[in-house]
Amino acid sequence: VANLQWSGDGVYSMQQVEEEGIKLRYAVPKASTNLWFDGWCMLKSGIGKDKEKQQAAQAFVNYISRPDNVVRNMYYVGYTSVISGGEDKTIYDYIKYMYGSEDKKSVDYDLNYFFQQNGDNYNYVMKTSEEMSKGQLYAQYPTQDVMRRSAVMTYFGDQANKKISRMWIDMRCFDPRIKKNSK
């Protein structure tokens, strides 16, 4: 059985069924995938030249981007952190707490590509279970190989977006038992 989901939704699903003793894995197409990320932006039309609104918006983004708040959001929604935390290792420590393993069968999972900053000599390779290296950890922090073959989607225009939306619906609702009329 396969299901198409964003990584955060995949993590949520994996956590939910794990309580029932069901194990799910997260997979990324070998050819390519879109690079997914969430972010906040300040719209010019919403802030305009209002310095107080701009300051409030910047304060909010700064607040939710503090490592301690990033961890709270990761815990609550299951999505990847928007920042690495810089010199603050709170986010990395949280990931190790959630997905780390000291079992003899654990495997190395390299997160240097995400966390290592210029001049940082810390080695962000953690021990995790084989299961997590293909499950929740992999969904939140895919391997560097996956990141290399990922691309940011662009805006296609109204007509193309309608076609893409139709393709997405067809894919999500695909039922191999139903034969499509070829006429």
Functional labels for PLM-detected ranges:
Residues 13-16, 63-70, 76, 167-174:
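Structured segments of extracytoplasmic/periplasmic soluble domains
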Residues 7-12, 31-34, 47-48, 68:
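Solvent-exposed loop/turn segments at secondary-structure junctions
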Residues 117-183:
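Conserved C-terminal helix/tail region of periplasmic/extracytoplasmic solute-binding proteins
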Residues 1-29:
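Ligand-binding pocket segment of bilobal, Venus flytrap-like solute-binding proteins
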Residues 20-44:
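Periplasmic-binding protein-like
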Residues 43-141:
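Mature extracytoplasmic/periplasmic domains
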Residues 9-12, 41, 55-59, 68, ...:
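Extracytoplasmic/secreted proteins, especially bacterial periplasmic and envelope-associated proteins
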